A protein has these predicted regions:
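C-terminal halves and exits of single transmembrane alpha-helices
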Residues: 1-3, 200
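Central hydrophobic cores of alpha-helical transmembrane segments
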Residues: 182-190
Length: 210
């Protein structure tokens, strides 16, 4: 879906290998087809994107022997995190590659959406804190692994959620004179998205027997 826009982006055209690939006859034909059936391809991309977003959490939830994963909040947390990292990636691209002055309103909208998504993640994690601490043996062991690990507390919750939250909040309320704070926030959100998935896999404790 984004291929026609990529062919119009000066930055990508200037890249040695990418610029040549974008001028291939096959790529041009694909761009023409995508432009012609733009609405259909767009909806197809939306369906595929939502499917990829949701399925990871649903897959983890299907393991009943792991209390950390067998939780209705897991698909919700992973879905919110996926949309948040998507917003962060778009902001990163718009501030570093595209740099179109006409996109100011869109960038501000993405910042507001990401702010809401980060807030939702923090609320969900707050509920996970009590669910795991007061849950089964498997849940309590997962709690110990997560909430005593500085990588989770400082890396994910601190730098992956709280710091970007305040950077984007300041940008939405008062604005920034430089793009650096929002770029920093976007990079931190992407890092936090990885750490969430890493620690969720790491802290899944199997309850035996099941």
């Amino acid at each position: 879906y984004a291929l026609p826009y990529a062919r119009e982006t000066p930055f990508l055209k200037r890249l040695p290998l990418v610029g040549k690939v974008l001028e291939w006859r096959m790529v041009i034909k694909i761009c023409e087809a995508v432009t012609r059936f733009r609405k259909f391809v767009g909806w197809l991309a939306v369906i595929n994107g939502v499917g990829v977003t949701v399925y990871t959490g649903l897959l983890l939830q299907s393991f009943p022997a792991v209390a950390l994963w067998a939780n209705p909040g897991v698909p919700l947390l992973f879905t919110v995190s996926a949309f948040s990292t998507a917003m962060a990636f778009l902001l990163l691209i718009m501030y570093t590659v595209i740099k179109d002055a006409e996109d100011t309103r869109i960038r501000l909208l993405y910042e507001r959406i990401d702010l809401v998504l980060i807030s939702a993640e923090l609320v969900i994690l707050f509920s996970f804190f009590f669910y795991l601490k007061r849950g089964s043996e498997s849940a309590m062991r997962s709690w110990e692994l997560l909430f005593t690990d500085f990588g989770w507390l400082i890396g994910f919750i601190g730098f992956g959620l709280i710091v970007p939250f305040f950077l984007e909040l300041r940008g939405v309320v008062k604005g920034w004179t430089s793009h650096v704070p929002i770029i920093t926030a976007s990079v931190l959100v992407l890092m936090g998205g990885y750490l969430l998935r890493h620690y969720f896999m790491y802290a899944g404790i199997y309850a035996y027997p099941w």
